[in-house]
């Protein structure tokens, strides 16, 4: 299955996902981009290599059909499609000039009186250090339920796949812990397992829960997998002190799951092939410092 898209059948079954929207995403990569950017810093943009397109899905469970329903949105990652539904999506760059970027997305809905649904999406565009932990602040006395996590499945290992021992990356769900002031999801550290299920480049993970308090401005804390200090990013969370809104909104809009990231070299004008919720296996080209070469 090397160099192919791998998804859970249950994620693309139309009957099991009523109302779902599907997007195919492509990354257009050039081995020479980093070198060119080093000599042309004022002209370089290493963050416009992604494009996406919406598709409808039919068929299953053995064969699926993907039909485009809109034109390609060029030079933007697919998480930006979520912003069109009312979500907030922000770009984060922990080490400008030395590493890539990731995106923090979030949306809060009020599906019934006294219940608020919190959805968070973390997308690693080209951040070599990867993401290992995500923590959301909670107010005193907040009751949390329906805690959820979603990550795309990883490919099994194969010879010279670039992972430690050719074992492939782990697909183990992240651990979740809660105390009086926060809820935290995390995978193993790099020191514990170099093949841990970190959020690597071109991959999006989802986190969610319900709470009995309305949203307030807060900070989430993200810890990185390979290197770097923790980073705080603005979100909304049930931190307390707000006035509950009695009018419920529609049921919670599902966060986009990880989108396909083929690694073919092309110009950004190419139309990405429909690919649901994949997990890219090869390492990214340098973003923007030299990193080990992509594995086959």
Question: Which residues does each predicted region cover?
Answer:
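Low-complexity, intrinsically disordered segments enriched in Ser/Thr together with acidic residues
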Residues: 1-16, 184-217, 224
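Beta-strand elements of well-folded, non-transmembrane domains
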Residues: 28-32, 124-126, 211
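Solvent-exposed beta-hairpin/edge-strand motifs
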Residues: 133-166
């Amino acid at each position: 299955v090397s160099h192919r898209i791998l998804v859970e059948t249950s994620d693309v079954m139309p009957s099991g996902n009523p109302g779902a929207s599907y997007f195919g995403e492509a990354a257009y990569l050039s081995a020479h981009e980093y070198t060119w950017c080093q000599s042309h810093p004022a002209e370089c943009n290493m963050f416009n290599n992604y494009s996406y397109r919406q598709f409808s899905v039919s068929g299953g469970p053995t064969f699926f059909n993907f039909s485009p329903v809109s034109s390609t949105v060029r030079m933007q990652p697919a998480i930006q499609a979520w912003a069109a539904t009312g979500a907030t999506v922000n770009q984060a760059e922990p080490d400008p000039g030395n590493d890539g970027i990731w995106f923090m997305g979030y949306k809060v809905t009020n599906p019934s009186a006294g219940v608020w649904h919190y959805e968070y999406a973390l997308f690693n565009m080209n951040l070599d250090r990867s993401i290992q932990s995500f923590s959301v602040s909670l107010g005193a006395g907040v009751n949390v339920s329906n805690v959820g996590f979603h990550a795309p499945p990883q490919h099994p290992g194969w010879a010279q796949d670039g992972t430690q021992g050719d074992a492939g990356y782990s697909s183990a769900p992240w651990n979740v812990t809660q105390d009086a002031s926060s809820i935290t999801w995390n995978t193993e550290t790099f020191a514990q397992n170099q093949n841990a299920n970190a959020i690597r480049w071109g991959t999006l993970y989802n986190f969610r829960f319900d709470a009995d308090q309305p949203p307030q401005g807060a900070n989430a804390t993200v810890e990185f997998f390979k290197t770097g200090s923790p980073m705080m990013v603005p979100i909304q969370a049930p931190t307390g002190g707000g006035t509950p809104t009695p009018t419920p909104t529609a049921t919670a809009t599902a966060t986009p799951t990880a989108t396909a990231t083929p690694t073919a070299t092309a110009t950004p004008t190419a139309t990405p092939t429909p690919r649901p919720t994949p997990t890219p296996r090869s390492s990214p080209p340098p973003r923007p410092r030299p990193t080990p070469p992509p594995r086959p």
